[in-house]
């Protein structure tokens, strides 16, 4: 298991990609990504919910059934392919990494995967960036600001830099 050192918390609160006020602004870009059969990974319940409202079905959705730490009930019904994993806040478990990699290798538009995290899913962005194809889009919410669009090829080195600084336990 990897844990987030306190000194990295403020750094990881900064967007790893381009921040947009709304998913609507990049809707066309996301539909294009799907039409080219390129991977979209959604991290977070609000982001996933907003994508599905726009009829954008990410091949991988990583959720924890909370929005801003408050329980949320939603119905992700675009797939029966549901995987459960425990991942404490401020951590990246080996199991989460394995499930992210397995999902990246198997998920398609016709076979999407929902990863339901018991704990917190926020740091899943790092193993996703490090293991996804370079043309993958990863989206996650930036609380009170909007949504972050991460282009893996642009964020890989930054994610690798952060990942190396996590504490191994």
From Swiss-Prot:
Its EC number is 2.7.1.237. One of its GO terms (molecular function) is GTP binding. InterPro entries: GTP-dep_dephospho-CoA_kin (IPR007164). It holds the Pfam family DUF359. Pathway: Cofactor biosynthesis; coenzyme A biosynthesis. GO terms for biological process: coenzyme A biosynthetic process. Signal peptide: none annotated. GTP binds at residues 45, 64, 66, 121. It catalyses: 3'-dephospho-CoA + GTP = GDP + CoA + H(+). Keywords: Coenzyme A biosynthesis, GTP-binding, Kinase, Nucleotide-binding, Transferase. The keyword Transferase applies. It is an enzyme of class 2 (transferase). Belongs to the GTP-dependent DPCK family. Catalyzes the GTP-dependent phosphorylation of the 3'-hydroxyl group of dephosphocoenzyme A to form coenzyme A (CoA). This is GTP-dependent dephospho-CoA kinase. It comes from Methanosphaera stadtmanae (strain ATCC 43021 / DSM 3091 / JCM 11832 / MCB-3).
């Amino acid at each position: 298991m990897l844990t987030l050192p306190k000194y990295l918390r403020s750094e990881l609160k900064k967007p790893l990609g381009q921040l947009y006020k709304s998913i609507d602004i990049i809707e066309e870009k996301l539909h294009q990504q799907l039409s080219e059969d390129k991977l979209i990974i959604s991290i977070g319940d609000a982001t996933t919910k907003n994508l599905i409202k726009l009829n954008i079905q990410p091949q991988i959705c990583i959720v924890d059934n909370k929005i801003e730490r408050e329980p949320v009930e939603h119905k992700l019904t675009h797939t029966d392919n549901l995987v459960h994993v425990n991942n404490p806040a401020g951590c990246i478990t080996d199991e989460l990494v394995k499930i992210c990699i397995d999902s990246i290798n198997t998920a398609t538009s016709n076979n999407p995967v929902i990863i339901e995290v018991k704990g917190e899913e926020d740091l899943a962005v790092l193993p996703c960036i490090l293991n996804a194809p370079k043309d993958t889009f990863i989206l996650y919410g930036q609380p009170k600001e909007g949504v972050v669009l991460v282009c893996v090829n642009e964020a890989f080195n930054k994610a690798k830099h952060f990942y190396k600084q996590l504490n191994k336990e």
